[in-house]
Amino acid sequence: MSWSKVKYFFFDTPEEKEAAQYAYEKEQIEMKKQQEPPEQQDVPFTKVQPKQNVVSIETAKQSSKVVLLEPRTYSEAQGIADHLKGKRAVVINLQRMSTDQAVRIVDFLSGTVYAIGGDIQKLGPKTFMCTPENVDIVGAISELFGEEEETNIKRW
């Protein structure tokens, strides 16, 4: 008796062979479906409307506040930063402070403005404008300041 006859006698029946052949054919069909590109289907095309730049009037009013401040000590820097966090632009006049404290406030506010994605611009000698991300600063002010600025004594 050959090995194939023994194997056939103990393991494979004609029904099992037929089931295995059917599974093999089914697997081949699935592989062909995966290899073929999908059929193109007609999908109705809807026209995409461009976004409208509509802003409610209340939102526009709220984001258009400008706060004018004249701090006298460095401890007021946190209050200025709170205005910026509240999405309000701030104009700061630092002329009534010592230069050292004014530099510290500008450094602090520069970090704050960077953290909220805003901007800081110098408007004049010791006068700055800090804006949050919802306010854009357009244009520039020429640097025709006093003689102190021209002699480069302490420029910051």
UniProtKB/Swiss-Prot annotation:
- InterPro entries, per this entry? Cell_div_SepF, Cell_div_SepF/SepF-rel, SepF-like_sf
The protein's location, in the record's own words, is:
Cytoplasm
What keywords appear on the UniProt entry? Cell cycle, Cell division, Cytoplasm, Septation
Major site of localization recorded for this protein: cytoplasm
Q: Would you tell me the Gene Ontology cellular component terms?
A: cytoplasm
Would I find Cytoplasm among this entry's keywords?
A: yes
Gene Ontology terms: biological process: division septum assembly; FtsZ-dependent cytokinesis
Assembly description:
Homodimer. Interacts with FtsZ.
Query: Can you tell me which family this protein belongs to?
Result: Belongs to the SepF family.
* Stored PANTHER family: CELL DIVISION PROTEIN SEPF
Primary role: Cell division protein that is part of the divisome complex and is recruited early to the Z-ring. Probably stimulates Z-ring formation, perhaps through the cross-linking of FtsZ protofilaments. Its function overlaps with FtsA.
Protein name as catalogued: Cell division protein SepF
Tell me the organism: Bacillus cytotoxicus (strain DSM 22905 / CIP 110041 / 391-98 / NVH 391-98)
